[in-house]
Swiss-Prot record:
Purpose: Part of the ABC transporter complex FbpABC (TC 3.A.1.10.1) involved in Fe(3+) ions import. This protein specifically binds Fe(3+) and is involved in its transmembrane transport.
Induction per the UniProt record: By iron deprivation.
Gene of this entry: fbpA
Consequence when changing residue 37 to A: In strain: TN106
Name of protein: Iron-utilization periplasmic protein
UniProt source species: Haemophilus influenzae (strain ATCC 51907 / DSM 11121 / KW20 / Rd)
PANTHER family referenced in this protein's UniProt entry, alphabetically: IRON-UTILIZATION PERIPLASMIC PROTEIN (PTHR30006:SF15), THIAMINE-BINDING PERIPLASMIC PROTEIN-RELATED (PTHR30006)
Result when mutating residue 24 to A: In strain: PAK12085 and SB33
Amino acid sequence: MQFKHFKLATLAAALAFSANSFADITVYNGQHKEAATAVAKAFEQETGIKVTLNSGKSEQLAGQLKEEGDKTPADVFYTEQTATFADLSEAGLLAPISEQTIQQTAQKGVPLAPKKDWIALSGRSRVVVYDHTKLSEKDMEKSVLDYATPKWKGKIGYVSTSGAFLEQVVALSKMKGDKVALNWLKGLKENGKLYAKNSVALQAVENGEVPAALINNYYWYNLAKEKGVENLKSRLYFVRHQDPGALVSYSGAAVLKASKNQAEAQKFVDFLASKKGQEALVAARAEYPLRADVVSPFNLEPYEKLEAPVVSATTAQDKEHAIKLIEEAGLK
């Protein structure tokens, strides 16, 4: 009897050791905190691996990772803009992601890492939010380029400091050329109203300060969920037909090559791309899941109906060039 109890105690100890044999991981998080917290909790429940989130702005965290190099305490970089991977990849700071994991979110138009060292996880669409008590869909332009004209002077808000805006400038430059991109930026400066954040621009439309603004879709969906669509003045307009104004930008994750917990870090990225991970993410924030078997509870415009332009993954050079155009236009 004592021998049987000894065997049971030994088995229990072994199982306890097995359950806790994974190391904790640290994630440098530039994704919106509620989304990152939701997926981190879901991952902890699924695996028992504890996740510590070090949250901040994606660009600042990417710069910190470059400074820290192989001494970084980070295991994973989770960002709201895949463009921030460009410098890190070029510097050789990212570890390869398995092809099996990458293929889980590989849809038409979704950027793929040239070195297969990061993965896109969710999308957000550029949209025009407008005050439906002052404007209707027939007043909306067919191209985002037309909002930077005297017709819209004092009537269009924009946020030049957001990562999605930078991505839109990159797309404009690639699709239409530098001259068109620069003229658009100068037109916005001349005719538009500058706001510090997308949420502030949205609220300006709600408050009647400006009749329309260029923002990301999820800000409106989150506000609609909170207050009810019937209580909002604002509505969304989707530009579509592969116009730069229909751009979809993507969040993503990468494993740091310097991570001492490679297995756990890779497991976390695998989870983010899995059905359970995607469900946790899109339940917390109105972003587009990149898996066909996951549906957002926010009643989003169907991903395939966005008609977003297909633009190659942003490189470090693309980013630098877009920043120069923004600066040349006097927006920074």
